[in-house]
Amino acid sequence: MPHDILLNTLSANAPHWRALPLKDKIQLLDTMVIALQSLNVEGHLEWSAASLRTQLMDPVAQELEGAFEALISVSVIKGQLTRLRSTLLALSSTGAATRPKSLRVHTTSKNEEQIIAEVFPLETADKFGPQGKWTGELWLKPGHEATQASCMVEPAAGDAPAPTRVCVVLGAGNQGFLTLVDALDVLFVQNETVLVKHHPLRGYQDKFMRVVFRPLFDRGFMGAVFDTTVAESSALVSDPRVGHVHMTGGKATHDAIMWGSSQEESADRRRRNEPKLKARMTSELGCVTPWVVVPAVFTEKELLHQASHLAAVLNANSSCNCNAPKCVMMSGTWAQREQYVEAVKSALRELPPTPPYYPGETGRYDRFRQAYPSSSHQIQSNADVVRRVRVKAHGGSDEDGVAANGVDIGPTDLPFLTIDMEIEADGTCDNNYALVNEAFAPVVAFVTVHNAETTTSFMEAASNICNEKMFGTLSCTVILHPTTQREYPMETERLIANLKYGTVCINAWTALCYAVDTCAWGAYPGEDPKNAESGCGFVRNTLMFDHVQKSVVRAPLIDQAQVVHVMKPPLNKKENVVDIVAFILKPGLATFGRVVLPRCCCSRLFCGSLAMVLVISCVTIGVLASGVLKQ
């Protein structure tokens, strides 16, 4: 096997990594932050340009998208590094991980006690910036104490020796930073050595990852491979030196690894309950993500704000995100339903479409059109479509949107597909295809729920439909007007408690919850490995809680963070976004000045948006005040 040497090294070093003193791991994290900074803004823009080419986009024509991708990657990766450092520092100095702001006890519908840890805001800096008004909670499994960092406890004398087996991380194909985040979690939270296998779409990121993770590569705690054949990949995960496989990807890949690639083998192994994979498997798979709009009287400003928010997240990354909203659920008696749907469609028309770059995307899109021939509609974009450059990003077919490297064959975008669906409060409907099939394509269903006449009956029906009739348990958004929360406090809390999703977000896209780096991300616990949907296990668990059930994040109905990705002034200029990237990389007065001062002095650039100046000022002051980000 080609990877024998790597596996031998990682296996031999696994006990050393597990026993490595915390101060040494903290030093490694510090070195990694310095390495992340060493790429400078230019290096991160080069990284994002490679990602854009993978997405069949021209990095020159789409320079703003490239700057935003750099902003997201830098924010997520540095946030995780610094938050892990804070947790390990607390463990080292006090013997306990960073504690939450507070703990409270919730009594479940089964009369069980459940601990809820309030984890955001955790520090002063968390209260500043676009997410300053948000709150984040970790709900633990009922009956468990709020224990943390069990994997970091040194074995007592006489205990079994530390494991010598390796974790293989199978990298995501739709977002570059996900692989790095997964590797960080396995290394520092689960305390295992890691061999990363890059996704065929993302092999370009190997050189960037080797810069950031260099101290771990140098000491034999981490390795990486790409361009492996199917046979080599299968042999890799089946190797006896591999004790854990973690993947971010699709259900079909998960099932092929776990149960076998052929239908016959898979069915036989499931029947005998004999998985093909002998190692432990954790995963973050897909979901038909609900976007539940609880009926209320919204002002025009509130309605248009949330419509713009939804349209932007639908369009992001060609809608190839595991948390892309796929079913917008509304009450049939909501007076503003048609106005809201038309506002979302109108906002979609103003957004430039993204190319169908992901393997099989066009085929999945067509299958949804075929499933709903009379109730599906294509939204034609009014935005200027920049000519795309297709690149040979993977070994797919022409259906996947792959042509010869560098050949400009013009716009090949898929118009956004909307589907009108009707469903009864008990979950019955004429055609449930959109509820049980993840599109991973620019498709969304507007689902009208009938016979749920009141606000409370709609909330109950929506919860039951999401839990019982829809594919996946990864994440869910609920749009809750403040008046609804005031008028129905017990009912809204019951809705949040009853939703069986690993992340429940109030009033915002769940990807923005992923950015709250004290919350965990993963499927709701309890999925059957024989019929996995959204997976098993959590990542981004920087506070190292042992028994996470789900994250709950609450945002205001109107909030700057909800539309930061819409690229409105001043974030519609590459240089403005790049300055923020520079500040996040190296917070200091010089980078602070580049973010704030030129914008304060140039009202034409800001188009009068003093509010944004204040937002950015709060972000930067908060970061400067935070000991977490200081070097």
What are these regions (language model features)?
Residues 112-160, 395-405, 417-433:
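Long, low-complexity, polar/charged, intrinsically disordered or flexibly structured peripheral segments
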Residues 27, 457-565, 626:
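C-terminal core of ALDH-fold dehydrogenases
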Residues 28-29, 190-201, 225, 277-296, ...:
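Short loop-to-beta-strand entry elements in the cores of soluble alpha/beta enzymes
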Residues 166-168, 178-231, 268:
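PLP-dependent aminotransferase-like
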Residues 1-145, 185, 198-203, 212-217, ...:
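N-terminal Rossmann-like NAD(P)+-binding subdomain of aldehyde/semialdehyde dehydrogenases
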Residues 14, 33-36, 40, 44, ...:
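Structural signal for hydrophobic packing residues in well-ordered secondary-structure cores
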Residues 166, 215-329, 526-532:
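Conserved NAD(P)+-binding/catalytic subdomain of aldehyde/semialdehyde dehydrogenases
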Residues 296-297, 316, 322, 330-474:
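NAD(P)-dependent aldehyde/semialdehyde dehydrogenase
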